[in-house]
Amino acid sequence: MKLKHIIAVTVGAAALCAPSCDLDEKFYSEVTPDTFFTSPESTYAVLCRPFTHWKWYIGADRWYLQELTTDEMVCPKRGSDWYNSGEYYRLHYHTWSPDDRFVVNTYDGTTGGISRALEAKSDLQGVDYNAIGLNDAVKADHINQLNAITAYFYMRGLDYFGGMPIYYSVDDDLCARSTARETYAHIETLLKDAIPALSKKTTLGASEDGYIKQAAAAALLAQLYFNAVAYIGEEHFDECAEICRDIIGGVYGTYELDKTWYGPHCFDNNTSPEVIWTVPSENSKVEWNWYFKYFYHYSSYEYFGIETAGYNGFMLTPSLDTLIGGERLCVQLVQIEKHGERYDFDFSRADKDLRKKPYRYLGSRKYEGMFLVGDQTNPNNPSQQCLGQKEYSGKVINLVDQVARFSEVGTKYNSVAELTSTMADGEENSGVRLVKAPQPNLDDKLLRWNPDCPVIRLSEIYYMLAECELRAGDKKTAAGLINQVRGRNFEGGADPNPVTADNLDEYRMLDEWMIEFLGEGRRRTDLIRWDKFVTESWWDHTPLNDKNKNLFPIPNSAISANNLIEQNPGY
């Protein structure tokens, strides 16, 4: 069997799951230059295939594996909601299986992205670009964008599953998995070859469109080197640092840090000078919006002053357990063990952080705060209140930084002291919610879903370089790089607790990664790089100390489809 036959099966299965389709659309059995490629637009239609898949791939199941398995985010059972046969428990406790849908969908999505990129490359290689009003430089750019996005999908596969089957064409016969080192080398070659042929951003703040430019491909190569210690057991931090310095220095295009904390995430973030690669999103067109229903309460539309009810699922990992504290407008994000002592990953060292406010839309594209926490009355219209529908039916929801069955005190439990705080103990008001992508109100409803999803931004380059400097022993330089980003989070840049050579260690570095990139789908990878993913405790998670869990299992369905594929150790 050839790879393209697997593609057909995958695409067919995906079609059955699609929410809608155009039954009048015409399809052709094959794409040939004389029947399809008659204009420049036709080449972009083919180039877009893997990028459309990438837009879907960035969210949902991949995000779950990166965030809900870590100290950052969690999806507890809330009464009768969100148990889902224990699949979210398995993420939190690291007891997933080869048949769990998040694992299956991620493996299929990864290989599907690779196959779509290879298929598009095969179609475009035979096109005479000059004959349709383009030129050879544009063709080289297109082909190498496809090489770069192929490398992206292979790197995600390497991160999630280890060595992947390596294909060069959709006509290749099915093959066994290559080793992690071979997969790493393949990714490196694809990116090194692609970078020189890609276009370069020359205007600061020019709108990003989702396509891959030189800086994006260079950043992907930097990521590969950055995580080499986890991927292949070798340190390549020096190579990563060199690329990061070049990106910051403008070698691969014109970028700079945004002057505000919200710039990379706002309604017009496609023009932020910081964004390097984004998933485009625009109201009523191509909308990137999967996250909304999963994060927010059933009635959160009242708080936001907008339509659309939520599913009330995901939340920041709780820090208060069963303690009833005073009002908190910050999130003590996580507690893990540090050398036998409790250590908090939190915002408490930065109480003047401009992000540490309840989210509020101010009108005219402006907003403040990054969290839903506390009383969920609309701050702009007190008559709109987020009312409970379950344990707190008819009452204004008060989101708390804790998980426990407080509604059952006096009935099932005599006092708060008897409560437990586990994945089974959530209520509808449990947990602080993240608002990384802003929401307008009905007056500005056409702005909804306009924020693009930033996949790579310059802050990440600064942080990668900082960690490389830390590992090289230059804590002062590392601290300076982090502080260049941190400063914008405080009024007038007055950071009450900047990073210094004295307070910077592996835990503070991980802390800074989480605070800046909270909810951006990278936490698992950062923990693995520091050997913390399977060795540390947080909230209801006890470490298994099983390094096999740094990788997910190959789905049984993938092994059944290709019996040359072997399972990962420990599964």
Model feature map: region roles:
Residues 37-48, 52-57, 80-161, 173-185, ...:
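Conserved, well-structured interaction surfaces
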Residues 156-160, 165, 202, 227-233, ...:
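Short coil/turn linking the two alpha-helices of tandem helical-hairpin repeats
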Residues 100, 104, 362-485:
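C-terminal substrate/ligand-recognition segments
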Residues 3, 17-41, 151, 187, ...:
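Bacterial Sec-dependent N-terminal signal peptides
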Residues 22-85, 192-193, 215-404:
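An aromatic- and glycine-enriched ligand-binding surface/loop that stacks and positions planar moieties
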Residues 20-23, 82, 97, 110-113, ...:
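Long, intrinsically disordered, low-complexity segments
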